[in-house]
Amino acid sequence: MASYPGPGKSKAKYPFKKRASLQASAAAPEARSGLGASPLQSARSLPGTAPCLKHFPLDLRTSMDGKCKEIAEELFSRSLAESELRSAPYEFPEESPIEQLEERRQRLERQISQDVKLEPDILLRAKQDFLKTDSDSDLQLYKEQGEGQGDRGLWERDVVLEREFQRVIISGEEKCGVPFTDLLDAAKSVVRALFIREKYMALSLQSFCPTTRRYLQQLAEKPLETRTYEQSPDTPVSADAPVHPPALEQHPYEHCEPSTMPGDLGLGLRMVRGVVHVYTRRDPDEHCPEVELPYPDLQEFVADVNVLMALIINGPIKSFCYRRLQYLSSKFQMHVLLNEMKELAAQKKVPHRDFYNIRKVDTHIHASSCMNQKHLLRFIKRAMKRHLEEIVHVEQGREQTLREVFESMNLTAYDLSVDTLDVHADRNTFHRFDKFNAKYNPIGESVLREIFIKTDNKISGKYFAHIIKEVMSDLEESKYQNAELRLSIYGRSRDEWDKLARWAVNHRVHSPNVRWLVQVPRLFDVYRTKGQLANFQEMLENIFLPLFEATVHPASHPELHLFLEHVDGFDSVDDESKPENHVFNLESPLPEAWVEEDNPPYAYYLYYTFANMAMLNHLRRQRGFHTFVLRPHCGEAGPIHHLVSAFMLAENISHGLLLRKAPVLQYLYYLAQIGIAMSPLSNNSLFLSYHRNPLPEYLSRGLMVSLSTDDPLQFHFTKEPLMEEYSIATQVWKLSSCDMCELARNSVLMSGFSHKVKSHWLGPNYTKEGPEGNDIRRTNVPDIRVGYRYETLCQELALITQAVQSEMLETIPEEVGIVMSPGP
């Protein structure tokens, strides 16, 4: 049960050494004005102490220990100051010392190769002097010791089915390119970061890469403490099952009577310090016991953020991760050179399967812009012909028909064209998110947006439901294309969820090809300025209390209960490039005390969304309902610590462009196999030109990336925007058929479609690791490619886990200074 420090009680002890906040003195006075209200306090639902390193190995100490908070605050203060540095402290500048060293190394290698026949003894000595790295001999010795002790479990499990393809094998001693002390420090830090992510994923019942978990289990003193729930077993899918799931016998919104809903648990709900708590009685008082549901400890979260922030600017760790990423890129190029024709031959052997008829999911697309501009134009013209006299809008208390709305604009159906609609992004929207948002208004009129692409209006979202159903019909006709549409909940009023659910149920907006995500725009400052909200906690109550009520007593929100069965999770959206005037730390005001008109920072939104979602997931899992995941927009622009928060809390992210500047985070996202839905055409119009997009680089290194459309209304021209996205990417980056099918398979894996549906699309064994989990008859991805990805990931995980397991190095003294990039 959660314990809260009440009046007169001391606050829970902070797990790291207390230091004065650098922001308190370094940040501008106006950035802190009015935000000095009650600070954040520890709030924990699980009994007992919850230290950060609860299930870590005995020794994961590094040279950064004791300095994480100080280093993180320094980096936060740099981001607030908007430094004019040529490169950020977490990225590599263009003239990187590592690149210079690599060039020198290559020149020396060429010189040595020229002298090999003349002076073999000189060659040997030169190679030993130049390539000498402590990590080689130490790691080799460790391997020999491990074999001598009979510890063969990890190696035996890594034996995969032999696949007929050519592998690149580095013979001899392991070459990491860094001294062993740096290797061990980097390996410990990377492992510690992976443990942190695993902890938060388990806490919220989100997924974590099974391969990574298996390697981390070799290091943990004891298994991670998780809640287990009884689940009804899924009906197994046979190996010969059709690629199309069976059709539903009846519409999922058919029975909406409260009498058919699950029973009432009779539990009470109340939000305390920004998180909904569940009590054993309907009207809880101060002495009413709580239902024990776990959620993240706040002090522990801030400490974990500080650890990761300090990690990404550590010089030796950046060098290690940069080298590993470069190695992964080069290794993939060699793999393609050796096996491209074999992969193509394997694809050609599969009957009735090619890129067009494999499942692909648009994992990042907004419902309000899921149609293309021609589709919207035709729909508006059709509505003007058929429903001219329908009352669609209220202007200053006077009802208006569709005819009157267009007459007030001096427009007829004949006047309308794609150009007058003016919803497509152009060169004027680059780095201008405000102008891009204005493109959501057809003909520049917000009233048309309200009439045609809103769920809550005078006609109860009738037109929007019709156009969404037309898009769904197109997806069903294509058979193999699917989408996860984003619908908005703003948090301005408590009845938003019920209105949205009634819109979906009453208009029967459903398709087996579509799942929903709910996006929460980060617009508290706008609502607070207009006086619509008193504090940030009111916004959180409006977003989450209806969900808890529908879970505890489904009959009280029957439409919402049905609608939530088709919702995958939550998204956090807004312009990331907007400056943040506050840093989320222990001095930040609690949600009920956040009454200023400043917008809370990104991490603040994400933490409270995650904390409430974790509580909700455990409650829903107890009832046998499906759970939600967190899949925010992240890394499109703005500061790097957005990606740090998402690494800890999010199952997948959208965009992730800034990973190209942060080698440590990019390596962590690779090792954890975090899904990244990338939208190159969207980025090309807003933040990054197409040829600079890092998607092909991410794909070659093995990150879990997929292609998505984001906003077809603004960026695409054809009836099939997802195919348009694949087509342009293939032409510009010269992707192979295997690359395209791999992207499509990734999109299905990271999507929120049910396990049974994925079993039909990918094969009943898709959850298994490596080639055993691939069915080329359904995915058209050769086992060669899947085997290469799996073996490479295992080798990278083995490298860092073996280094941590090594006992050759004594404990690093805490007095050793860390190497940081130069400050401003």
Curated annotation (Swiss-Prot):
One Pfam family it belongs to: AMP_deaminase
Residue positions, PTM Omega-N-methylarginine: R44
Phosphothreonine: residues carrying this PTM: T133
Keywords linked to the UniProt accession: Hydrolase, Metal-binding, Methylation, Nucleotide metabolism, Phosphoprotein, Zinc
EC number: 3.5.4.6
Binding site for Zn(2+): H364, H366, H633, D710
Catalytic activity: AMP + H2O + H(+) = IMP + NH4(+)
Pathway: Purine metabolism; IMP biosynthesis via salvage pathway; IMP from AMP: step 1/1
Keyword Hydrolase belongs to the record: yes
Protein name: AMP deaminase 2
Gene designation: Ampd2
